Each structure stands twice: as structure tokens, then as C-alpha cells.
Amino acid sequence: MLQTKDYKRESGGGRLTLKVLLIGLVVGGLGTSPPTFAQESGQKTFSSPTAAADALAAAAQKHDKQEMLAILGHSGEELIYSGDRVADKANNDHFVEKYHQMHRFAATGSGRMILYIGAENWPVAIPLKKSGAKWYFDTSYGKQEVLYRRIGSNELNVIKVCQEIVSGEREYYAASHDGDSVHQYAQKFRSTPGKQDGLYWEVKSGEPESPLGPLVAEAASEGYGHHAHHAAGKPHSFHGYIYKLLHRQGAAAHGGAQDYIVDGKMTGGFALIAYPVRYRDSGVMTFVANQDGQIYQKDLGPRANQIASEMTEYNPDDTWQPVDGTENTKVSDIRG
């Protein structure tokens, strides 16, 4: 459904932390007065705000997206379908949990009712509005704010994940793997079964974690499973973004154009790209980084997914902007 996260940057070392709180339909920013919107044709109406909220919570609990669309109207489709099924399910579950924990209503000066949920009194971005004797969710009123918050939280998360991947590649390079004494970077995320030719491999009890072990464990705890990044050669989304390793760099990169792989081993460096599953829905900016740790970002436009998925080299020219606080990232800054 919808999501928000309470996030912040900690001072000292540039470490990025995310206090993830996935709550469906919850955002702030309702103090402004956007234009008035009409009820959508065919949208369900209710006898009271409580009846409307109860119906939405019941539909979310059953993950009944058709019923949720009937309640929110067709303009709510982008809010319900983010492109990340795991995140959508988690958001539904958290909304239901917070709704049943506590909920109340408060009137606004614009004639709408705001639903607050959970002990934290989170305001739901989509207000309720009265039409005649009936109430309905005024989805268009709060839709843009919901998308802004979803995109913002996803983009902060992708920076953290990129830093973890940089840290993981450095950790991989520092050790030998599969009896090969040559120091090299991993060419893929998930290792071949029984090998350590990727950044993640399964370990037995008591064995050290693989470089991406903690990140994969975090993804698994959120419902993404061990295939959070790639499986069978197919990319999978993680918090609305897809990640891909790049094996060469272009002329705009420091050191000029070159292949990272020499004689089958990636010794010359590494790079990665992270791009949104759905442009202006799960994210806007596309991100790249290499072994130096500096992350760059660029808005590739509506074709971002296609453009980024076809990229084969790291080549941040002057149209790419550095992400503040990620320059010269140290492993200690990321791992803590």
C-alpha cells in the first residue's frame, strides 16, 4: 500500500541510519491547503468516518487490493501498487497493526476529517470528506504527499544499501576465496552454491558472515528472502530499487575507460548502479558508486528503468551530482 519511514543521518563519520517504520497511508504535511478535489466516479461512500476507516483496515488486512481501490478510488492505484510486492504487504500489515492499536479522528478547517493511528498518533495523508450524508476518502487531496514521502524514504534506504555494497566489496577484496590467492572484487551478488564467487553465500552455524550476509538477513526479515538482489539472473527489487554490479567504467570516470575484469578476475575495481522499479512511484533518482565510495545521483527521466537496466559501465559525467556525506566512505563509517 503506502509507506513512510522515520529517518535521520547521525553525526560523526557520515553514517546513515534508518529507523524503519512502515505504516500504510501515514505521512505528515497536511497543514497546507491544496485545491479541492471531487469524489471519484464509482468510489465507495460510507455512513461515517469510522465506517470508512474500518472498511479500509479490513481490506488491507485481507490484502484485497480491488476492495482497497474501490474505497480509495482509481487515483489510489499508484499508492496501492508501488512495484514492490514485499513492501506493499509489509505496509498493509503495519497499517492494520497501528489502526487496531489505536485510532481517532480530528476535524480540519477545510471540512475534512483526518485519521490518526497508533500510539504515536500518525496522521493518515488521505483525509475523509463528506458529500451529502456520506463520507469518502479524498484520495487526490493527499496523493502527491504520499508519493513524495515514499520516494524520499526509498532513496534514503538506497544510499544505505549502496554503502553496504561498497563495504561488502572491500571486505571481499581483502580476503582470499575458493583457494584463489589473487585479491579481487566479486562479480555478482549471490555466489554459486558451494562457492564464494559472490558477495553473499550461505554459512553454517559459527562461521563468519559473508560480506552481504547482514544485508541479506535484514532483507529476509522483511520478507524478501535470500533472493533480495538477484536470482536466476533476474533482478529483484528491494525497497523499490533494483541493484546491478558493473564490470567496466567509461571515459568520464577517474582513470578513464577501462575494464575491471582482467584474465577473468575483477581486480581493476568495481561499480554498481541502483535504479527505481517505477519512476516517480518507487523512486526518482538513479544512483551509481564505485570502489572510491562516492555515490552519485541523476534523474534519468520517465525511461529511467530501461536506461539504467541497459547501462554496462560506470561513467558519471558532470550531469551526475555527488550525494552529500558519501565521499571517501570508510568501512567503519558504514558498519559502525
List the model feature ranges, each with a label.
Residues M1-L16:
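N-terminal secretory signal peptides that target proteins for export/translocation
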Residues T17-T32:
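Bacterial N-terminal signal peptides
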Residues F37-A58, G142-S167, E171:
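Short, low-complexity N-terminal intrinsically disordered segments enriched in polar/charged residues
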Residues D64-G76, H183-A186:
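Short, well-ordered alpha-helical segments enriched in acidic and aromatic residues
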Residues G76-V124, A232, H236-H239, Q249-A251, ...:
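Surface-exposed, charged secondary-structure patches
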Residues M113-L156, K160-Q163, Q294-K298:
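Short beta-strand edge/turn micro-motifs at domain boundaries
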Residues Y172-G283:
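Flexible, glycine-rich surface segments
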Residues G268-P322, R335-G336:
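C-terminal soluble interaction/assembly domains
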